[in-house]
């Protein structure tokens, strides 16, 4: 009933808050890249498990735990840490332009996700072949792409000066 929906919403908010604080307190000790990698793996697992529970129509506590895993993983990685890393990786001469492009790209892709989800969710393919799980599998796939991208392409910025970052980019 409504009480269960309220409890679930409280769990979502609590996990989001707790794991945001995990990011705040570990970003300097663990580094940015390890948080990205761990968070992206958690996001992939959360979306994959959720997609599987929807596909098999076995929704219940496992679905809720998968959602909480995704929320917690995002809150400790791609949510807050990306902004720390972006502010550290660009030299002063281009930082404002680079941050503007990053923010614009984020909002563009947020709009794409928000507008594509209902289209994919309501599609005949999704409803007839995937029992409503296709969007979660698609987003899980994008988490894998993000994982490989971070692993191969994103440098660790922890403890690096702006000069070191500038030298890193000029050698690539």
Where are these regions (language model features)?
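Alpha-helical transmembrane bundle of multi-pass membrane proteins
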Residues: 1-172
